[in-house]
Amino acid sequence: MKMRTIAKTSLALGLLTTGAITVTTQSVKAEKIQSTKVDKVPTLKAERLAMINITAGANSATTQAANTRQERTPKLEKAPNTNEEKTSASKIEKISQPKQEEQKTLNISATPAPKQEQSQTTTESTTPKTKVTTPPSTNTPQPMQSTKSDTPQSPTIKQAQTDMTPKYEDLRAYYTKPSFEFEKQFGFMLKPWTTVRFMNVIPNRFIYKIALVGKDEKKYKDGPYDNIDVFIVLEDNKYQLKKYSVGGITKTNSKKVNHKVELSITKKDNQGMISRDVSEYMITKEEISLKELDFKLRKQLIEKHNLYGNMGSGTIVIKMKNGGKYTFELHKKLQEHRMAGTNIDNIEVNIK
């Protein structure tokens, strides 16, 4: 009988020990799962308790398992976040699920955010490209504008562009400059600081200095001079002055003048063909300077007869009422000392 009781007790102890071992292994697994959610509870403590329970016996093992469960529940209640309490309680019931499933769920919840950001960045990067590419599509009718701009050009301008001779570029550039005419001006002298004297006029609050050369140097003394007209073409910065001209000073009209002068133009091209053109040139001044006359005549010849295009030699002959004459050579600029005022009878132009 004693042997039977000993055998029964040994079997009971064996069953209890196996049950305690399973309980402790489950408790260790639960502690590992809870360590991810609750502030990293150390698992070594549970293992030590399990070893003590195995040696102590089945009753102590069961009590320790119950105590460990009671110890876990307050630790879960002390978690800082309420959302984590709910998730930990549900996960304690499902201890059999592996830890990898939780990592998958975390990865699934975390991955959509960067994908959305990438999609937003791609859309933002593609949208400005469409804005940049759209303007050329809207501006497609530009060739129509270029054809319209080409049509108004006169044949003389096209011929001047194609038949430009390099040696006449400087003359063409000078005689196509803008010119200024001011009437009824007041001129005064300042103390000369160079060998050339200058008359100062102030039209429109700008001071223009006019070099007195040739006949003008003797005609105009210290001044001041009232009721004068000036024809101004700005020269190169020869005297370190920003705005200065040479000659072109005449007296203001005392009466209205409409004087028509005969203008005869004879032109001989490179092939030897000769053409003649006779017209009238209107003079509206009692006194006109050779500077103004030379500049306006050459500008008219450039616009209408392609002067300094493929032809640039010849003469302009100005015949005076008193029988004298002035001859301007077209291959060079009018000399400064010949820019004084005069009275004109007729004009002859020969272009070669």
Curated annotation (Swiss-Prot):
GO terms for cellular component: extracellular region. InterPro entries: Enterotoxin (IPR008992), SSL_OB (IPR015282), Staph/Strept_toxin_CS (IPR006126), Staph_exotoxin (IPR008375), SuperAg_toxin_C (IPR016091), Superantigen_bac (IPR013307), Toxin_b-grasp_Staph/Strep (IPR006123). Residues 1-30 form the signal peptide. Residues 142-164 have a biased composition (Polar residues). Residues 69-104 have a biased composition (Basic and acidic residues). Keywords: Secreted, Signal, Virulence. It is found in: Secreted. It comes from the Bacteria. Residues 228-326 are annotated as: Sialyl Lewis X-binding. The keyword Secreted applies. Residues 61-165 are annotated as: Disordered. Residues 114-141 have a biased composition (Low complexity). Interacts with host TLR2 (via its extracellular domain). Belongs to the staphylococcal/streptococcal toxin family. The C-terminal domain contains a V-shape binding site for sialyl Lewis X. Secreted protein that plays an essential role in immune innate response inhibition by interacting with and inhibiting host TLR2. In turn, bacteria recognition by immune cells is impaired and cytokine production is inhibited. Mechanistically, by interacting with TLR2, blocks ligand binding and thus inhibits activation. Second, by interacting with an already formed TLR2-lipopeptide complex, prevents TLR heterodimerization and downstream signaling. The interaction with host TLR2 does not involve sialyl Lewis X interactions. This is Staphylococcal superantigen-like 3. The lineage of its organism: Bacteria, Bacillati, Bacillota, Bacilli, Bacillales.
